[in-house]
Amino acid sequence: MEIIFYHPTFNAAWWVNALEKALPHARVREWKVGDNNPADYALVWQPPVEMLAGRRLKAVFVLGAGVDAILSKLNAHPEMLDASIPLFRLEDTGMGLQMQEYAVSQVLHWFRRFDDYQALKNQALWKPLPEYTREEFSVGIMGAGVLGAKVAESLQAWGFPLRCWSRSRKSWPGVESYVGREELRAFLNQTRVLINLLPNTAQTVGIINSELLDQLPDGAYVLNLARGVHVQEADLLAALDSGKLKGAMLDVFSQEPLPQESPLWRHPRVAMTPHIAAVTRPAEAIDYISRTITQLEKGEPVTGQVDRARGY
């Protein structure tokens, strides 16, 4: 079995060594320009067109949970990868736990009004504030995939009313499920904290805009953990300035790194992190990839395959 690996920043030697230990019968090599030798599987992130073009691969693994970048490249260069070759994304591989940590910590931060207390501290004001009640602090999750399910599971223990919005109906215990555009308004109307975990598709670009934000309760919060292109940043800022939104926590942006001139840097009710909510953890990624390749070789059913038509 031949496996080729390409990532512009990862330590290729470490990955090659780890994969060969996990798959003793495989020969793994770092792909370099000019390497046209046969391969059965490819592990990639931002691969050049020539790496995959013309290869008769059994499968391609994308070294991340998001596949929008490679799908966009495949649309621009259809010769890059035959449509019959399955494409896999990393399914959880530690990202679920990271998303749980991030989402729970931020929801609790807002629920306990730590943002308000920080503002009071900046004014040197000692002023206990009324508490919020859990019943009025409904959390709505847009996107009900693997990561959305993990976040909902982690928030259940804290007793917040939970709801999710997705393409298909979910039957998660303790979570109200809303489906499609026809139920979006009902989902938003009672959502105090909106958590975005949607995939990046043509249908979801710019979805968090003024029309959507206007349907949230006054004083709502937005937590974006998915993609920056989901948010119309000017609309978000306008909602913050008007008081419609009380706060926003952003891990992703329409342009990264975020330009220094962006008003998001200076807005007092915007907090941010530099796209670190859930990063690839190599050891867990190796475990998932080696396990999935073994299942594929045995003809067993696998999970994590990308639906190219849907975009995730």
Curated annotation (Swiss-Prot):
GO MF annotation, one: NAD binding
Function of the protein: Catalyzes the NADPH-dependent reduction of glyoxylate and hydroxypyruvate into glycolate and glycerate, respectively.
Family per similarity comment: Belongs to the D-isomer specific 2-hydroxyacid dehydrogenase family. GhrA subfamily.
Catalytic activity from the UniProt record: glycolate + NADP(+) = glyoxylate + NADPH + H(+); (R)-glycerate + NAD(+) = 3-hydroxypyruvate + NADH + H(+); (R)-glycerate + NADP(+) = 3-hydroxypyruvate + NADPH + H(+)
Catalytic residues (UniProt): R227, H275
Localization (cell): Cytoplasm
Transmembrane segments: none
Name of the protein in its database record: Glyoxylate/hydroxypyruvate reductase A
Superkingdom of origin organism: Bacteria
InterPro entries recorded: D-isomer_DH_NAD-bd, GhrA_Enterobacterales, NAD(P)-bd_dom_sf
Disulphide-bonded residues: none
Gene from which this protein is expressed: ghrA
Keywords tagged on the record: Cytoplasm, NAD, NADP, Oxidoreductase
Any one annotated GO CC term: cytosol
E.C. code: 1.1.1.79, 1.1.1.81
